[in-house]
């Protein structure tokens, strides 16, 4: 498209990237004002990072769908179908669903064992001390760098392809609106814009699906697509596929990608602080449900999108409708340009606009989650831990804002460098498992197992990553003769590096744990070592007052919100204890459900079709398409309708308050808020904070926590220094 046909003018690119970005930014500013006025949401440091720790299941699921839908999700999965046929959609979708499903187990334990945490790295610090903390900060930041690089690389390439907009300009402008609304609304802004983006995304996929499979005069049915692509395979069979067909799950290249996809995405989920941010922001009872429902809802998005657009590209590439007028090059496919070309071929300029909107939504929603992930690491794991442990909430908010801006435009510069170096989105996607996969097991065991010791947690990621990079490069040299960009991108080399990265820790962790003896960590210590930020100053200022000290009583005067919360604590204590018990009991159920789903997604569903080398008949392919269209309807219910239903009471209160203001009945709003303080978000947030604090004070004695007879020192760094001495 870039060298022969650009369906949209450059102005369309700027209108979407800049104009739509500012629309979302303005909308978030307005939403922040509405939430503050009608729900009493105060943007404290805690609120910025955790949204009051009360987000419900439906919205968590919607956020999971949005955050996990990258430009690589849409463009990369479509390229897989274009390259390998029908297996590409399943191997991409199910190979990247299993990680979110299994992460639910990790989320529920992190929420239970560190209820005051803002990042998973705080758990690492609380358990293993400074050295290990820095190791995982490195891997966490590298994960965010790789993900954000893919977002900007894939998104800018698509914008350029559809509009001719300069790629460097696109890279610099894509983060602008995201930064603005993230600064104003924090993680709550991310959640709400995630919801809006997901609605638009699903609607656009439905439009493409019904056009391709039902209404288009160019295609119009699964049967027509099957016939066209079957003829294509007769003249140009797909090497490595059973019978050379595009309608088989048995594909050598597809199978390799399946393994690479599974391994690489374990790192981008288990090491991305953004997914832990959502776990810590969730209502305790919603934590694992949001991840399970969200993973199932997400699976249909890349599956149906890639199935639709990949086969549309295969069917239309050799017709007069194809905008390029020639087949795509391997570089264009690797850059993720199959989807925008297919959209233009299918619906002309309307299709190009829809593809542009879809990719813009995917890039900006996922990037906002990455910005929050990095800002919380910078704020709580670096600034609050090592620079200013007594920082006020206002200072932490300032650090969060600064780190958001710095990371966004550092990554823009890095993405520009990748563009000039001609490193594609597809290359980054397959390489990320080699770089970050070595830290997956040890980071998970830090939360799940009290036996993993300091040596295993600290050295396993370093050793595994070094071996993975070595294996990747050695395989490239031995199998392909030289180490170049294109040679390291070969399936065999990428597969080798990814497998070594993920699987080596399964050997190293047990060996180091056996040699240096297992730890017996007392989880109760995390309650002492990881604390919430004191919000009194911010809350008092939000109400128009200040916080001062009462020298006679020797404790700070509380804000009005905290006073009200204190009055409600006793009445809520029993329910709080029940929620903690439910969280504990839910873990076993969660593990059974998640493991069952994972086996179904990775083994039971795709493997029989792979092993039998079955080639889809026309009827079977039609049924296959129908199943995924129905699945997307479930996704629409789960992430569009269900969040509204769950929040119906809050929405009613908000719109009623707006009505009272617009009709000159503001006195009713103030009277209702005074009579029902328990309904106010800020009060509920403080209530949870006070319940959390009072629940653990009796478990800490002289700086030590007592559990099952084993006592872990309160300061792990001091203990390690003593041991070394």
From Swiss-Prot:
Name the glycosylated positions. Answer: 390, 584
Keywords in alphabetical order: Glycoprotein, Membrane, Transmembrane, Transmembrane helix, Transport
Locations listed in the record: Membrane
Q: What is its membrane topology?
A: Multi-pass membrane protein
Give the main location.
membrane
Query: What would you give as a GO molecular function for this chain, any one?
Result: putrescine transmembrane transporter activity
Residues passing through the membrane, by range: 15-35, 57-77, 88-108, 134-154, 167-187, 195-215, 256-276, 296-316, 343-363, 396-416, 428-448, 454-474, 496-516, 589-609, 624-644
> Known catalysed reaction(s)?
spermidine(in) = spermidine(out)
- Please list the GO biological process terms of this entry: putrescine transport; spermidine transport; urea transport
- InterPro entries of this UniProt entry? DUR, Na/Glc_symporter_sf, Na/solute_symporter
Q: What happens when the gene is disrupted?
A: Decreases significantly spermidine uptake. Reduces significantly salivary gland-secreted histatin 5 (Hst 5) mediated killing.
Q: Name one GO cellular component term.
A: plasma membrane
Function (record text): Major spermidine uptake transporter that is also used by salivary gland-secreted histatin 5 (Hst 5) to enter into candidal cells. A major component of host nonimmune defense systems is salivary histatins, a family of small (3-4 kDa), histidine-rich, cationic proteins secreted by major salivary glands in humans and higher primates. Hst 5 is the most potent of the 12 histatin family members and has fungicidal activity against blastoconidial and filamentous forms of Candida albicans. Hst 5 cojugates to spermidine to be uptaken by DUR3.
Q: Which family does it belong to?
A: Belongs to the sodium:solute symporter (SSF) (TC 2.A.21) family.
- State the name under which the record lists this protein: Spermidine transporter DUR3
Organism for this UniProt entry: Candida albicans (strain SC5314 / ATCC MYA-2876)
Q: What is the lineage of its organism?
A: Eukaryota, Fungi, Dikarya, Ascomycota, Saccharomycotina
């Amino acid at each position: 498209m870039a060298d022969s046909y650009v369906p949209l003018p450059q102005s369309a690119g700027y209108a979407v990237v800049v104009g739509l970005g500012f629309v979302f930014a303005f909308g978030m500013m307005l939403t922040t004002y509405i939430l503050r006025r009608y729900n009493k949401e105060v943007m404290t440091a805690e609120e910025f990072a955790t949204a009051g720790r009360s987000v419900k299941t439906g919205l968590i699921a919607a956020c999971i769908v949005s955050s996990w839908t990258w430009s690589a999700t849409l463009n990369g999965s479509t390229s897989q179908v274009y390259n390998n046929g029908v297996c590409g959609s399943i191997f991409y979708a199910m190979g990247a669903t299993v990680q979110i499903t299994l992460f639910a187990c990790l989320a529920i334990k992190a929420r239970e064992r560190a209820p005051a945490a803002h990042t998973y790295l705080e758990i690492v610090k609380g358990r293993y001390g400074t050295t290990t903390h820095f190791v995982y900060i490195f891997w966490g930041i590298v994960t965010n760098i790789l993900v954000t690089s893919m977002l900007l690389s894939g998104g800018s390439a698509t914008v350029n392809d559809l509009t001719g907009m300069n790629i460097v300009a696109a890279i610099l402008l894509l983060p602008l609106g995201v930064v603005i609304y993230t600064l104003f609304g924090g993680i709550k802004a991310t959640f709400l814009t995630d919801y809006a983006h997901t609605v638009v995304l699903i609607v656009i996929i439905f439009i493409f699906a019904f056009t391709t499979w039902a209404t288009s005069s160019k295609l119009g049915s699964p049967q027509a697509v099957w016939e066209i692509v079957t003829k294509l395979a007769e003249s140009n069979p797909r090497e490595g596929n059973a019978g050379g067909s595009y309608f088989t799950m048995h594909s050598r290249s597809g199978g390799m990608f399946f393994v690479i996809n599974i391994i690489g995405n374990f790192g981008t989920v288990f090491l991305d602080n953004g997914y832990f941010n959502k776990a810590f922001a969730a209502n305790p009872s919603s934590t694992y449900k949001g991840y399970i429902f969200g993973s199932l809802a997400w699976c249909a998005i890349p599956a149906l999108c890639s199935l639709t657009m990949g086969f549309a590209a295969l069917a239309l590439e050799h017709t007069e409708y194809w905008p390029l007028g020639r087949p795509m090059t391997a570089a264009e496919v690797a850059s993720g340009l199959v989807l925008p070309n297919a959209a233009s071929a299918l619906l002309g300029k309307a299709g190009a606009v829809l593809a542009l909107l879809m990719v813009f939504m995917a890039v900006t929603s996922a990037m906002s989650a990455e910005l929050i992930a990095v800002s919380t690491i910078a704020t709580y794991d670096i600034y609050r831990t090592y620079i200013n442990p007594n920082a006020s909430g206002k200072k932490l908010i300032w650090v969060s804002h600064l780190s958001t801006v710095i990371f966004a435009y550092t990554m823009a510069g890095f993405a520009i460098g990748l563009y000039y170096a001609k490193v594609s989105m597809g290359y980054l996607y397959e390489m990320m498992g080699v770089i970050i996969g070595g830290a997956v097991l040890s980071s998970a065991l830090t939360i799940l197992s009290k036996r993993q010791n300091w040596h295993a947690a600290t050295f396993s990621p370093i050793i595994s990553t070094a071996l993975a990079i070595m294996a990747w490069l050695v395989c490239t040299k031995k199998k392909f003769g030289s180490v170049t960009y294109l040679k390291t991108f070969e399936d065999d080399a990428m597969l080798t590096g990814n497998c070594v990265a993920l699987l080596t820790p399964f050997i190293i962790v047990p060996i180091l744990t056996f040699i240096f003896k297992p730890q017996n960590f007392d989880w109760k210590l995390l309650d002492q070592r990881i604390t919430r930020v004191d919000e009194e100053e911010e809350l008092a200022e939000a109400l128009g007052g200040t916080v001062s000290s009462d020298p006679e009583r020797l404790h700070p005067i509380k804000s009005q919100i905290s006073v009200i919360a204190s009055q409600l604590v006793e009445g809520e204590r029993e329910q709080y204890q029940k929620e903690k018990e439910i969280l504990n009991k839910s873990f076993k159920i969660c593990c059974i459900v998640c493991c069952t789903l994972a086996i179904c997604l990775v083994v039971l569903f795709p493997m029989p079709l792979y092993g039998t080398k079955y080639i889809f008949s026309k009827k079977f392919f039609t049924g296959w398409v129908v199943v995924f269209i129905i699945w997307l309807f479930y996704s629409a219910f789960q992430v569009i309708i269900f969040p509204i239903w769950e929040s119906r009471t809050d929405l009613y209160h908000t719109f009623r308050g707006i009505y009272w203001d617009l009709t000159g009945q503001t006195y009713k709003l103030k009277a209702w808020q005074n009579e029902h303080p328990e309904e106010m978000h800020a009060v509920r947030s403080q209530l949870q904070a006070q319940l959390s604090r009072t629940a653990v004070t009796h478990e800490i004695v002289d700086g030590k926590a007592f559990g099952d007879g084993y006592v872990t020192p309160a300061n792990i760094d001091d203990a390690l220094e003593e041991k070394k001495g």
